[in-house]
Amino acid sequence: MATFKLIVVSAEQHIFNGEVKGIQATGSEGELGILAGHLPLLTAIKPGIIKITLEDDTEEVIYISGGFLEVQPTIVTVLADVAIRGKELDRERILEAKRKAEQNIVSGAKDASYEMLVSKLSRELAKLRAYELTDRLTQRKR
């Protein structure tokens, strides 16, 4: 299967730079599957995960807080505010942040709008999904 170059960068650092067979992400208009030779595209991406299929058919997961995805004939670039490899996520920290976000929604925290609170909870749930998917992929390798 043909490959293409994928670059994933956050505001702080380069997260991924290499040849891949494909990626899956959630764009502003729905789910995207990108393979080599995809037509050019520029789209906003929603907070969630990017699932990468590497050259050796292994998979990697990256949490994305949102951003943009650009597809060119031989290169795909993901520009994200925050991007964290699934293997670098800390389950306990995610669960604690999720618990706090849920408490803030229930108590109606005065320092934030309801939409901001729900957005925070959604980001933590996406991180948890990235962690769990990475954990499953890691167990499959064993």
UniProtKB/Swiss-Prot annotation:
A UniProt-annotated Pfam family: ATP-synt_DE_N
Taxonomy, superkingdom: Bacteria
Gene3D superfamilies in UniProt: ATP synthase delta/epsilon subunit, C-terminal domain, F0F1 ATP synthase delta/epsilon subunit, N-terminal
Lyase in keyword set: no
Localization annotation: Cell inner membrane
Primary localization: membrane
Gene Ontology molecular-function annotations: ATP binding; proton-transporting ATP synthase activity, rotational mechanism
Assigned GO CC terms: plasma membrane; proton-transporting ATP synthase complex
Keywords of the record: ATP synthesis, Cell inner membrane, Cell membrane, CF(1), Hydrogen ion transport, Ion transport, Membrane, Transport
Topology versus the membrane: Peripheral membrane protein
Range of residues in the leader sequence: none
Function description: Produces ATP from ADP in the presence of a proton gradient across the membrane.
Family: Belongs to the ATPase epsilon chain family.
Subunit structure: F-type ATPases have 2 components, CF(1) - the catalytic core - and CF(0) - the membrane proton channel. CF(1) has five subunits: alpha(3), beta(3), gamma(1), delta(1), epsilon(1). CF(0) has three main subunits: a, b and c.
Protein name as it appears in the record: ATP synthase epsilon chain
Gene (name only): atpC
